Amino acid sequence: MLKNRIKLVCSDIDGTLIKSDKTIGELTYKAIHELVKRGIHFALVTGRFKTGVLPVMETLSLTDKEISGVYDNGAYVEVLGQPTSSYGVPIPLMFEVSKFASSYNARSVLFSGEEWVVEEKDKWWARINGFYEGRGVCEPFEETVRKSRMRNDSEPIKLVLRLDDDVKMAALKKELNILYPSLSFFLSHPDILEVSLKEVNKASGVSAIADKLGITKDQIMSFGDFDNDVPMLKEAGFGVAMKNGTQCALDAADYIAPSNEEDGVGKTLFSLLL
């Protein structure tokens, strides 16, 4: 039975844990606190940079010393506040990808330290700056790299490509996969293309946490809704997709939960685990 087996619960954030208005359902809030109370480890697994996750932790009334985190789709992992693994795309390669993507009119965004960075303001500036609580910076990317090295950041610099043309995005993704076989390119949103090392994804991040805690694959339960959640849904002993999820996520899951708008994570945890 799941109740006697699961020792680590992992959850995606956007479209899974939180509702479209960025709130967390009452049942989900209670369920996560009950997990922590019972000694079942909980981890947030997301494409967001850690800075973008801190408001979610605040909403949960939990700190990074109480729960673990997989950030940047697996590029940076912390276990109970301690950095565990960090796998960034080499800077020269990152700049090369950014330059090529500009030929498709894709916009590059870097995430570094507590900042997100663009080289020039565009139509996404206000929306992203609001999402990241005013931490946006407009500067040459070379300066971003210099500052990160001066700070000796644990979390690697992350590159994201934004393009709101589905046809162009598909063509760009296809060509990048051919040109850069050592990298992985995947959508975390219809207009957001993530860039990472080939072997790095949410599943590798979850595995890093499990290894550190001495937890086996069959003792992991994971929640997700999008294509980039598929690796961790498959990696977990019990994968749960949200009803609002993509077809790829639904196909990869062992169980379908109510949607994020219906407090699906909380309902499922209380129904199956707590």
Please place each PLM-identified region on the residue numbering.
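Mg2+-dependent phosphoryl-transfer enzymes with acidic/Ser/Thr/Gly-rich catalytic loops
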Residues: K3-L8, G25, I178, E194-L274
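Conserved acidic, metal-coordinating active-site core of Asp-based
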Residues: E96, F100, Y104-R107, F111-F223, ...
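A general structural motif
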Residues: K3-I6, G39, D64-E66, N105, ...
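Active-site metal-binding loops of divalent metal-dependent hydrolases
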Residues: I13, R48, G74, G224-F226
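Non-catalytic pre-domain segments flanking phosphatase-related domains
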Residues: M1-I13, K30-H33, K37, I215
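Active-site phosphate-binding/coordination module
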Residues: E26-R127
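Conserved ATPase-coupling elements of RecA-like P-loop NTPase cores
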Residues: S20-I24
